[in-house]
């Protein structure tokens, strides 16, 4: 079972102040896609996918009085416990202690991007991902890396197993 979480903005053409018939609950939100403020409704969507069937589990209008993290955490608490090996798919925004641990309680492992400022504890030493990657490159220990080819491009991948801030026994590639 895959649980897919993402947020989006349904853009509107005019702000309420300029519209003849103002749109209720529309607001300005930062669009990472457009890299600027965008006027419209922002929603957090959750899809469940299993055996080729994908269903909309919920779509919640974003309310600025409650963070997106808390909204997704609440969804995780309400979602049924996974009966089989299951995964949460999300972007780096949602890969945080509250969300990951809430989904772990429901039997979901998390697959998502990790921000470079995320804290790891390699060999018990606290450092961010960017710092740790630099140390691995400095060490020039090729045997620590696995060469992976994706669409003809080659990447060196390192597997970290250990703790993140507030998340135990994580695997980071």
Segment roles from a protein language model:
Residues 1-51, 153-154, 158:
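Active-site-proximal, Lys/Arg-enriched surface segment
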């Amino acid at each position: 079972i895959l649980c897919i979480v993402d947020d989006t903005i349904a853009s509107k053409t005019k702000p309420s102040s300029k519209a003849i018939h103002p749109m209720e609950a529309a607001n300005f939100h930062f669009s990472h896609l457009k890299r600027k403020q965008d006027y419209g409704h922002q929603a957090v969507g959750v899809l469940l996918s299993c055996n080729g069937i994908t269903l909309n589990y919920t779509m919640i209008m974003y309310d600025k009085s409650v963070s997106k993290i808390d909204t997704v955490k609440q969804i995780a608490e309400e979602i049924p416990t996974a009966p089989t090996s299951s995964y949460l798919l999300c972007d780096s925004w949602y890969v945080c202690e509250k969300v990951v641990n809430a989904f772990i309680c429901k039997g979901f492992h998390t697959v998502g991007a990790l921000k470079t400022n995320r804290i790891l504890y390699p060999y018990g030493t606290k450092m961010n991902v960017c710092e740790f990657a630099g140390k691995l490159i400095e060490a020039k220990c090729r045997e620590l890396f696995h060469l992976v080819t994706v669409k003809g491009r080659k990447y060196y991948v390192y597997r970290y197993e250990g703790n993140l801030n507030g998340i135990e026994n994580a695997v980071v590639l």
